[in-house]
Amino acid sequence: MGWGQFIEVNVDLDMRRLSEGDRQLFNSIEEDMKQYYLNTLFSPEVDDLKMSIDFHLVLESVSRGGSQIIINAQAIFTNKRDQYFYAKGIQFPYSQGQKIIYTPSFDLDPLASFLNYYAFMFIATNLDTWEYMGGTSFFNRAIELSDLGKDSDWSVGWDDRWKKSRKIKSNQYLRSMRFNYFTALDALGAEEVDITIVKNAMSIFHEDLLTLDKKMGSNKETLHFLKAYHESIAELLSALNLKDTLELLLLYDHDNKKVYESYLKN
């Protein structure tokens, strides 16, 4: 366990596409990336998030230009619940045993900055559960970092990351749904339950989903969120007798249709 925002990090390195000789370069990178996430304090203001992530890195090729070794890769990051990021177009220079060092200033380091970007995205989404739009400053850090990446000598993949962070930040409906769902859960877990807070939060949740459906239609990030929490959401809505919201979810989230139907029958 480290002393940063992440308390559990599982790194899985896939080197099947590399030659046996090239694989020797990466003896320590798995552990180095894990320790980087565990021991980096990405922001001293939010040091109690206790996040866990899985990080699957596929090394696609190793090329040599002059004295540099250049790595091309793709990756999947997930918090094993509602956050899932697929990263393609990862490119960075690397030398055997290279240490990954965090610098708070906005100097682009192709490998560290790539890791920082996803740290910022996980932190932003987590903060959105604690405070309304609480993750905005971290979404902005991810966007600013992507801007730097796009304008750097290592621009591959950064335009996609720039678009992704802007898209998620601008989806105020999902961000509000997430906040209000967790607000309702917190209120239910209090020593003295104020049912008005719970009902108000889930009423806003309904309005947000309704507006999101009208303005955006099927949204990948929203469906990931519902995939993770649909059972708990349905149980809560049923207890509150909010059948309209269950019916809305039934139409929006087809993959979990049977769950919503079962709670509507109760």
Residue ranges and their predicted role:
Residues 12, 199-266:
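A cross-kingdom marker for long, charged
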Residues 20-28, 109-113, 220:
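Soluble non-cytosolic domains of exported or imported proteins
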